[in-house]
């Protein structure tokens, strides 16, 4: 492993020690960081981007970590990526979420890649281990918000956006399966099948034929 990346990993593991994800599984927070870094690497991210993936929540969630400290330890370039990914915790949560939408188009390519990986990991967690007590509406609102943020990013590798959308589909389907009615779950399945067919380039007539066959139990 590259020295920069291994140092960033060690630093993040120490700073995030004792933190857990919000999902029912209560996984150590470092599981999220591992996945984000792995996705950035898989999508051909630079060494700086992979290091930033490990560090992206340290300033926000691990006081007294600062951008100045990250610059000293890991370089200005890495610290700048982390700065692009750090919310202002002094702002209300609703404002921070709105700022993520507004600021997404301004992200550098490296920050865009880490943000995409971060949202992909979070959506996967919503699909498989959602936070305790989240209603159907809250899950769907999060999925829609994450889609808006990602849709505004200026750099989206094809493999990355494909994985993100696949997890969004699964998160929506699981939400309806867990908390919706049978009819809602069926309708969600149809919407997801239609979206996937469109992403694969199927024509309107092909999609119509497929959906009719599905509804008639021909598949």
Identify the meaning behind each predicted range.
Residues 1-219:
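Active-site helical microenvironments for divalent-metal-assisted chemistry
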